[in-house]
Amino acid sequence: MGLIVSIFNIGCAIGGIVLSKVGDIYGRRIGLITVTAIYVVGILIQITSINKWYQYFIGRIISGIGVGGIAVLSPMLISEVAPKHIRGTLVQLYQLMGTMGIFLGYCTNYGTKNYHNATQWRVGLGLCFAWATFMVSGMMFVPESPRYLIEVGKDEEAKHSLSKSNKVSVDDPALLAEYDTIKAGIEIEKLAGNASWSELLSTKTKVFQRVLMGVIIQSLQQLTGDNYFFYYGTTIFKSVGLKDSFQTSIIIGVVNFFSSFIAVYTIERFGRRTCLLWGAASMLCCFAVFASVGVTKLWPQGSSHQDITSQGAGNCMIVFTMFFIFSFATTWAGGCFVIVSETFPLRAKSRGMAIATAANWMWGFLISFFTPFITGAINFYYGYVFLGCLVFAYFYVFFFVPETKGLTLEEVNTMWLEGVPAWKSASWVPPERRTADYDADAIDHDNRPIYKRFFSS
């Protein structure tokens, strides 16, 4: 059963890598429609399976392939269409819709819990056809990426796309300036030709550094331990008398969903780096309390007597579970997708995002598959593993993840090429906006000891 559930993540990893190029060839919108169709095929295979576990298994993989493509192409399209001042907010909405889907899934499971036949799981799968229909219908109204249109020589369509996104006329001076900036950046990239998979290892153009950062950030999103809570939360709730796992799921889903609304504001108000740093710090504190109370207080007579629990300890752990989910949903849940969608140059974007997102799915598979075995062996000591990962996440973000708030995608690329230290990136100014008192050398280089960089930034 664990493999059937977690194999979905493997399909997602495959789909992101294999299907990401569809968006480069046929456009982001057609790409999204295509991968959604693949997702529907997977759902259809699952819902028609009767006493054939292998058919359901295959359907899970195929639907995962479709979702993997969506996870790459959707943030990609949003980041390329959105105006820079709300780009983070709009990419964050991708995560918000994901949490809404999780919440609705929990509600559906609760509504069908009294069925004891195939109806219980087929209703939830059947609703997936509705979400796919909404997705395809929505693509009819979304403008195509102006960067893709310029790349394939459809300049006038690109201007109309920018016009629609910014709600200004095609002749607006600001729009034309943005168009010229995008076109100039694409022309420079065209001189180097299309990026190959091997070029993702290039350090000269800083592509490898960006791929590495994307992989680590997406991996750390899973290693924050959020899925640990979604899996193990029912055990804690049982300790205080709430034994219905369906109700437990809804409570967690409500906190997760409504916390994501706050992230829509914070990601643009405070910036990507700040959100990730504060998120890692707050989740670290939550795990320290959660794991320590679980190890020392939840079972007064030891883990061998799990039927005897401390309600006070259970209540404390539930409170910090909710704090953790709030901290995760408002920072790392969508923040890593925002940063990855803004980081890569256009010519390497689909491949770079695919690799980074695949890392997320692979860690999702490993955690969902092995968590039952690990928690069965070491119980709440498992929390200290994630605590250690969060310590690493905090320092990694501080030293290696630059701020991209308020910059165009072309300006983000310039910042990477200049080699601006991550802890100084919030002060970096694009060349065309620099004044006489701007000290580029002071921003681009920092010879201070590491501890001084950390405490003075």
Swiss-Prot record:
InterPro entries: MFS_dom, MFS_sugar_transport-like, MFS_Sugar_Transporters, MFS_trans_sf, Sugar/inositol_transpt, Sugar_transporter_CS
Residues in the Extracellular compartment per record: 24-29, 82-87, 144-247, 296-319, 375-379
Ranges facing Cytoplasmic side: 1-2, 51-60, 109-122, 269-274, 341-353, 401-457
Residue intervals passing through the bilayer: 3-23, 30-50, 61-81, 88-108, 123-143, 248-268, 275-295, 320-340, 354-374, 380-400
Superkingdom per UniProt: Eukaryota
Topology within the bilayer: Multi-pass membrane protein
Residues modified by glycosylation: N194
Gene Ontology MF: a single term: D-glucose transmembrane transporter activity
Pfam family membership, one: Sugar_tr
Compartments reported by the entry: Membrane
Function field: Probable glucose transporter.
Family note: Belongs to the major facilitator superfamily. Sugar transporter (TC 2.A.1.1) family.
Protein name in UniProt: Putative hexose transporter 12
